[in-house]
Amino acid sequence: MWNVTAFICILIGASIPVGLIDASLATGLVGAAASLGLLASLTALRPGELSFLRSVAGPALAAALVPALWIILQMLPLSFWANPVWKFAGETLGAPLSGSITIDTGASLGTLLLWLSLLSVVITAAAIAIDARRADMVARSIAATTAAAAVILLLSSAPVKAWLGAARDETANGFLVVVLVGVPLSLARALDGGGHADGRTAAQLARLRGLLAAGALFCAVSACWYGRRGAAIAIAAGVALVVMTFAARKLHLHRWSSAAAAAAIALIALATAVANRHPDVALAIAFVDAPADLVQSTHNLLADLPALGSGAGTTATLAATYMDWQGATTRPVVATSAAALIAQFGSAMFWTLVAVTIVGIAAFTVGARNRGRDWSYPAAAAAVLLTLLLAVFTLPELPALPGVIVLGAVIGTGLAQRISRSRLRAG
């Protein structure tokens, strides 16, 4: 299994070059590598570990298959659910077309491959992280990769580009997702005083925790410098959840006291957000700091969409109708990621995914609260989910590809370490 661990660590590091090459090629490479890692990890598992993996990861993966099934359904030629664009195209061509929900089957197929790659990485990371020493190795790889991504963000930011006399091309947008994932993970690992026990001395542990804390701070500064207010809000929420979990454990608070504190913080944050939202626009774009014309065009796009969406991965195609872009561009075509997801999957599926994400945050937080050693893994997973949940409402649609591997690794390690094997056997 250590060979598989080394492979997944290399794959995590490969998130950097993946974000710099052609998206179509990178999607295929990531899918192939993730499938290979999944096969290798399941083959290397011992019977007891396989049973434990099914227990901790099975329900989550079953829920995660629902979006994949929905994407497949969107690609099927179902004329009674077909997007109206197919009817208009048939009338133009003078021949009936057997349409589907999606308006771009190729784009939807690419999104399906990315989602399945994410699930493959989650399972592989969970299989590896059953052993705490291997989980620590994966976490350190994630921390190093996110630090490298943070450097790229700083060098790609508007002030630095202007100082260097170069135009901002925004090709580094995808690395923002990587950095957002890295901040809570590095912070949680820095606060976990008992989660690095693999023979290191006290001085070595202190040095490692210091490096992790410095990495978390550097990533947070880089993300806020690049993503401005939207990134700062998301990071603040993730950091707050990690710190709250740490404080609850340190002070030995009862679980209901922890839940009450979390609910109070959530209500305060919600009230603040509602007070500062854009009036008279859809909730998905009400909290973004974006130009008024972009917010309005996104609002118009959402108002005209069919209830079932227009297909996974089709935001750019849709936006061409509402935005006056000339040629290929990496600029955001909708105001928020939430708007992009609603445009692709439909409102009902989007809000279902939001609800499932909230349940996942609660489950990981409870696991971190009840865990002994290695509580930082489920705490990091909960904080990452919260960070990204808020980011979809405050940041524009960002390329998902660079963050797929890192996000899957964080969720996988959190699943494997949410419940100890000894406790599961005792229960």
Q: What spans do the regions from the language model cover?
A:
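TM-adjacent membrane-interface loops and short helices in multi-pass inner/ER membrane proteins
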Residues: 74, 295-331, 335, 346-349
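Cytoplasmic juxtamembrane interface segments
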Residues: 39-57, 125, 271-296, 340
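Short, contiguous acidic/charged loop-to-helix segments that flank catalytic cores in large enzymes
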Residues: 282-290, 326-332, 374
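N-terminal hydrophobic segments of proteins, predominantly signal-anchor/transmembrane helices
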Residues: 6-20, 38-120, 218-221
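Loop-to-helix transition at the N-terminal end of transmembrane alpha-helices
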Residues: 23-41, 56-58, 306, 406
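Helix-to-loop transition at the C-terminal end of transmembrane segments
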Residues: 24, 73-85, 155-163, 274-286
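Extracytoplasmic loop-helix module adjacent to an early transmembrane segment
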Residues: 59-60, 82-94, 286, 290-305
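Alpha-helical transmembrane segments of multi-pass inner-membrane proteins
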Residues: 3-17, 34-39, 109-278, 318-324, ...
